[in-house]
Amino acid sequence: MYYFEILEGLYKSKVRYFIAGGLSVNLYGVPRVTQDIDIVIAMDRENVLKITSLLKELGYVPRLPVSPDDLANPDKVKDWIENKNLKAFSFYHKNENYKVIDIVLVHSLDFEKSFKNRTVKRAKDIDIYLASIDDVVKMKEFSGRTQDLSDIEMLNKVRKYLEEKNG
């Protein structure tokens, strides 16, 4: 599973991120097919360059015909969002193009607050950061796609189960 290679790299590189898409739904225990990793990152220059460096090292390239380091330029990111309707900056593996990492640019969360409230899962000696169930639900409500509405229903069931289990 290519996910682990990415998650291990994020952990070792000390990237400030959390998983917020279908993979987070899976990691909360909801079976669901997903092909990519949707992450939200702190958009400060240092953090962005950590992740772009990691992705380049692992063989990932941007789907857009731009330098990956352009993601560290707030003016370019603003232009992509406002003038090109870009919602996520996608990277794919140059030899295995089904391996996709989407850095979500447009969402309804305050990164610092959400990072503080993240859920930490431990696997093979690394910490994996997930958006809290509440934050995943907020993001999915913001998107409003059919699959997102189904995910919200299932996440609410997981939340209820966890609340009952933990008292």
Q: Model segments located where?
A:
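Compositionally biased terminal segments of proteins
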Residues: 1-167
